[in-house]
């Protein structure tokens, strides 16, 4: 596993990032509803899997996942497999939840599952630090979530795709820090569509 600190510093310039991060107007962001069904690849954020499993994915998201080349991150895989250790084995719904999550994981094509390398991990740490500093987050708060989001953002950039997410806030900030990052946002459907 290789990490080149000077290259990461040259690329991200964390100490030169001084302007406060402000959420952009929603009209300035890319939305799944406005995306053509056919287009560039997408990397799915964990919320896409969760919303699909809960039957709360909007039709626009379903169509993007159906027609676009979908890439997957081992970061999201870890977030999904967390339930295998977290859920109470004595709860009556645990087995069915684990079965469904297991089936979802089994459907991920191995050649489209990407793991961050040393460069991505080191760069994501810097990026998460910059995001925390410029968004005035209290020290240590949200660190793990923002670190995971930074890894996902860097992986999407590496595969030449856009992140598909409903985590509008964090990925708006990340796309301001990484101008070459494309993000396609969506809002969860409340109707329970399957």
Give a label for each model feature.
Residues 87-91, 132, 181-183:
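Short, hinge-like loop/turn segments at secondary-structure boundaries
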Residues 3, 146-193:
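Acidic, metal-binding active-site segment of PIN/NYN-like and related structure-specific nucleases
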Residues 38-41, 95-103, 139-154:
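Glycine-rich, flexible loop segments associated with nucleotide phosphate handling
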Residues 1-79, 83-102, 192:
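Short, well-structured N-terminal submotif of metal-dependent ribonuclease cores
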Residues 2-6, 27-28, 82-87, 111-162:
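Active-site neighborhoods of divalent-metal-dependent phosphate/nucleic-acid chemistry enzymes
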Residues 104-108:
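Acidic, glycine-rich loop-and-strand cores that form catalytic or ligand-binding grooves
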Residues 79, 123, 173:
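Phosphate- and divalent-cation-binding pockets in alpha/beta enzyme and binding domains
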């Amino acid at each position: 596993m290789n990490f080149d600190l000077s290259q990461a510093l040259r690329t991200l310039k964390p100490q030169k990032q001084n302007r406060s991060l402000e959420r952009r107007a929603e009209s300035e962001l890319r939305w799944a509803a406005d995306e053509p069904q056919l287009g560039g690849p997408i990397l799915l954020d964990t919320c896409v899997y969760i919303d699909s499993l809960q039957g709360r994915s909007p039709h626009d998201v379903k169509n993007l996942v159906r027609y676009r080349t979908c890439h997957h991150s081992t970061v999201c895989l870890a977030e999904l497999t967390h339930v295998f250790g977290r859920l109470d084995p004595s709860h009556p719904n645990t087995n069915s939840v684990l079965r469904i999550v297991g089936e979802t994981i089994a459907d991920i094509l191995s050649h489209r599952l990407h793991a961050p390398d040393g460069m991505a991990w080191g760069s994501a740490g810097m990026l998460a630090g910059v995001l925390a500093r410029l968004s005035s987050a209290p020290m240590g708060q949200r660190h793990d979530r923002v670190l995971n989001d930074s890894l996902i953002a860097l992986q999407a950039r590496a595969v030449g795709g856009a992140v598909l997410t409903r985590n509008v806030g964090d990925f708006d900030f990340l796309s301001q820090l990484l101008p070459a990052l494309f993000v396609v946002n969506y809002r969860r459907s409340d109707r329970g569509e399957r």
